[in-house]
């Protein structure tokens, strides 16, 4: 009997606590965007079915283009329309310039001090200046054109060796990832760690690097419930915090080793690390080792995965739409021909190729929810009150498929970008102060690779079967089934590579 009484009192007080919590929350947060009812402690975490961008699109159809959720104890507002997106990054741009603090940012991103993880302020402005002037300026991007040319030609050579004059089945996914990682790492440090022809001077270092990057990509986008329910941090059932600490130590040791290796060289080369070390000699307070490590890490994580998946989605859609593939090939044959390889100087003339890439970015936005923002003050979005310290997510995937914004919104149709004003609606790289600074580099690298793949080879489906466009769950929108296709060398291969 006493046990039953105790249980009854416990249930009563627990219910009273939950009701009290709901009343306090309702009084504190008035005129919030609408959203589904939340549960005590977990909030709306039970609503978060994967993939999130599709779940959020479904919720926006029920609750409106601006809706709110509770991720445990943290308020989240999701924006799914172009007009509210514009409001966020024009009127509210400064208020939304902060980043939420997640556990991965503490360990992987040097205690929230890297360009993508730090909040708005003097440190961010310094990082943005360094990135714009010393890392991703047009001059610096142009200086790495030889690396991009060499890496894409290595890819073409390997494909040509395997295909020759007859159609042969090719697995493209891993080749595109290898090329993209080598491209970025050569820009950062002059080293190649991927593929059969990677630098053989230290195979163990290359293997350790590949393992490290694989874990970094997994953990940096990990769904960590302790970010939203702090009590779980003490339990850490998934051992996530320990894994974050371990990979943080490995990454820091690797980057420190790279910097020391370049610092002790007699002559500086054309790499990002060497260039920043030269600046460190004259301005050590601005170009510290930690800033150099953070910039290298940001380049590695932001500049690889997204470019590789965009190439894979582009080729997948071209194979599924042979009439579009033919138009790109005809454009290349008209402006470049088969007597020489396409060069970066040709890209401005290849307008249809550019439309294909833009259409791929629209339908298959590499980061469907972009990077999360955090409000530094109370603001208004879509007529609703958004309190300070709210996480704001932009469902770019939903905006890019909004039938009110795009005709035939779910159809792969590159011609849409021939119409004036369409390009301005594309938000794959964000907008405002926190827009991705690497857009220019990414578009140039993607354009060159895609152009060479189409100029140098004929492509077709395996047995006529359409490419499976199913998505894999994750922060980056990757294909569930790795891309395979049939390819055959075109005349330019013999004229350029086999003379």
UniProtKB/Swiss-Prot annotation:
<dbReference type="InterPro" id="IPR017972">
    <property type="entry name" value="Cyt_P450_CS"/>
</dbReference>
<keyword id="KW-0349">Heme</keyword>
<dbReference type="InterPro" id="IPR001128">
    <property type="entry name" value="Cyt_P450"/>
</dbReference>
<comment type="similarity">
    <text>Belongs to the cytochrome P450 family.</text>
</comment>
<keyword id="KW-0560">Oxidoreductase</keyword>
<dbReference type="GO" id="GO:0016020">
    <property type="term" value="C:membrane"/>
</dbReference>
<keyword id="KW-0479">Metal-binding</keyword>
<dbReference type="InterPro" id="IPR050651">
    <property type="entry name" value="Plant_Cytochrome_P450_Monoox"/>
</dbReference>
<dbReference type="Pfam" id="PF00067">
    <property type="entry name" value="p450"/>
</dbReference>
<dbReference type="InterPro" id="IPR002401">
    <property type="entry name" value="Cyt_P450_E_grp-I"/>
</dbReference>
<dbReference type="GO" id="GO:0020037">
    <property type="term" value="F:heme binding"/>
</dbReference>
<feature type="binding site" description="axial binding residue">
    <location>
        <position position="436"/>
    </location>
    <ligand>
        <name>heme</name>
    </ligand>
</feature>
<protein>
    <recommendedName>
        <fullName>Isoflavone 2'-hydroxylase</fullName>
        <ecNumber>1.14.14.90</ecNumber>
    </recommendedName>
</protein>
<dbReference type="GO" id="GO:0005506">
    <property type="term" value="F:iron ion binding"/>
</dbReference>
<keyword id="KW-0408">Iron</keyword>
<dbReference type="InterPro" id="IPR036396">
    <property type="entry name" value="Cyt_P450_sf"/>
</dbReference>
<keyword id="KW-0472">Membrane</keyword>
<dbReference type="GO" id="GO:0033773">
    <property type="term" value="F:isoflavone 2'-hydroxylase activity"/>
</dbReference>
<keyword id="KW-0503">Monooxygenase</keyword>
<comment type="function">
    <text>Catalyzes the hydroxylation of isoflavones, daidzein and formononetin, to yield 2'-hydroxyisoflavones, 2'-hydroxydaidzein, and 2'-hydroxyformononetin, respectively.</text>
</comment>
